[in-house]
Regions:
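Extracellular beta-rich repeat passengers
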Residues: 1-219
Length: 219
């Protein structure tokens, strides 16, 4: 469905009711939404499950913030083929990014660009499938801890065009311990605050709960 209308300047807080064993509601679920729908300036705070999840479709999302999601911050499924541009991820409970490959006969490539991620207590940085298809660029990670990593670079039918990753590692950290399977090739270690890629936080600080409460001061 091509979609119509818009969702803008919305803060979604403390959602994610449990509707079954291991089945909670995402903060924002975009299922088969088309590129004719405008989704921009979205904040998801303290959701029980994923922050934003895409199931197919071609919708584009810009200026988004996911803060303290109980599960993954950003989750893509079923050959979503849109773009996520200019976003911040803060302290998810599981993966910062869970980027799945197409299912069945579906195909498509999505783009994730211009993001800043504070990993905090996350279980992992990026989790990909063998068949994930995406362009992944201009990302900055900080607040990274031992045990968090970027793994499973697509090796089967998948496609990964990744570039311009920067990370601030913990003291004594080794890049290849965090960015594995060749992902260190497109990642550069930088001092905190010295990043030259990532999100433009200024468009989020003035209206989001995270910004108004002072929790984006380091961004």
């Amino acid at each position: 469905y091509k979609g119509q209308g818009s969702i803008t300047y919305v803060s979604i807080r403390h959602g994610g009711a449990n509707i079954g064993e291991g089945n909670e509601i995402n903060g924002l679920t975009l299922g088969g939404v088309g590129s004719g729908t405008t989704v921009s300036n979205i904040e998801v705070v303290g959701n029980q499950d994923d922050g934003i999840e895409f199931f197919g479709g071609t919708v584009n999302v810009s200026n988004a913030l996911v803060w303290n999601a109980g599960d993954d911050a950003i989750d893509t499924d079923q050959a979503w083929s849109g773009t996520l541009d200019n976003f911040i991820v803060v302290n998810p409970g599981d993966e910062c990014f869970e980027l799945d490959g197409p299912e069945g006969s579906a195909s498509g490539t999505h783009t994730i660009t211009n993001g800043t991620t504070y990993a905090g207590g996350a279980q992992g940085l990026v989790d990909l499938d063998d068949n994930s298809n995406l362009v992944f660029t201009n990302q900055y990670f900080f607040g990274v801890a031992d045990g968090q990593d970027f793994d499973q670079v697509p090796t089967a039918d998948g496609f990964l065009d990744a570039s311009n990753f920067q990370v601030t590692l913990p003291a004594g950290g080794v890049l290849t311990d965090f960015f594995k399977d060749g992902s260190d090739a497109f990642t550069t270690e930088v001092a905190e605050g010295a990043n030259t890629v990532g999100a433009d936080a200024s468009v989020l600080i003035g209206w989001t709960w995270a910004g108004l409460s002072g929790n984006l001061s380091g961004f």
